[in-house]
Amino acid sequence: METLSNASGTFAIRLLKILCQDNPSHNVFCSPVSISSALAMVLLGAKGNTATQMAQALSLNTEEDIHRAFQSLLTEVNKAGTQYLLRTANRLFGEKTCQFLSTFKESCLQFYHAELKELSFIRAAEESRKHINTWVSKKTEGKIEELLPGSSIDAETRLVLVNAIYFKGKWNEPFDETYTREMPFKINQEEQRPVQMMYQEATFKLAHVGEVRAQLLELPYARKELSLLVLLPDDGVELSTVEKSLTFEKLTAWTKPDCMKSTEVEVLLPKFKLQEDYDMESVLRHLGIVDAFQQGKADLSAMSAERDLCLSKFVHKSFVEVNEEGTEAAAASSCFVVAECCMESGPRFCADHPFLFFIRHNRANSILFCGRFSSP
């Protein structure tokens, strides 16, 4: 699973960078692990250049048993008896006249806990759209209701990849609501907006990353199975500078025990709620996945004997809310320890300007969610 962890982490940071570039001043939020597992499900049915492009974009070696690794990861992430609620749901919806292969359908169930649902896009496009939206709403406890907007499905649609994820976690150290107060959030040097800023002073893992001039804070959820990592540039450092130099290898190095040390720290973190949606086709083209979306070029012959089958639509919509109680969501470097700095009142982590954040499954070392908070 370590190979997959590195591959999915690399994919996560590449994906985050593309979304940040496309919207330089906007908020960003997505679930890279659910996107990569959904794509790997399509990879099961892909051959030739289509499969090569997808494997390369996902940083995967097709020779390895990647599907079994995804099976282990999804089982670990979705396991029962945790202190957090996390539900991932992938499903392919295919035109019923396409005659999908039973071997492909069985593999989807075995490795991805996902079934291929056959619908009649040709005869009942709008009913099919509503069916898909209802399924997603149910899987995300009503947080994501209109995944596919009106007229996004038509009689030409053949294959829709749907990817839903829902997360709700409580902090290991909750914030006290009585300390939450309005404070200015500096969007840039000219503009600021008010936010509800949470506050607590407690012991957390903290580091200062000299390479990018930023602080890195880890806020664990209950039982410390998952953590929120917040990467906050120093005052005067542009977040885009941090984004450009960020890699998964660096993030992994910065979060190692010799880099992050437990220290008493004042934490100021804004309450926020984000809901973002992305048409993944344009994003994935940036990553080199081109053929899968093109009729006549896509080779999905391990999925169906239909010659012109291609991926018609892949939409990713995600929701996150961070508050005093916790989070509700539905998507080799130099560093030194802040505790060693000479600060009279102890370290202070004040997230009153744009930052990157990651929700990590600690045991699997997997980035479940990542995003950028730029503006309230």
Curated annotation (Swiss-Prot):
UniProt keyword terms in alphabetical order: Acetylation, Cytoplasm, Protease inhibitor, Serine protease inhibitor
InterPro entries tied to this protein: Serpin_B9/Maspin, Serpin_CS, Serpin_dom, Serpin_fam, Serpin_sf, Serpin_sf_1, Serpin_sf_2
Modified residue annotations for N-acetylmethionine: M1
GO molecular function: cysteine-type endopeptidase inhibitor activity involved in apoptotic process; protease binding; serine-type endopeptidase inhibitor activity
Primary location class: cytoplasm
Pfam families per record: Serpin
Protein's UniProt name: Serpin B9
Lineage of source species: Eukaryota, Metazoa, Chordata, Craniata, Vertebrata
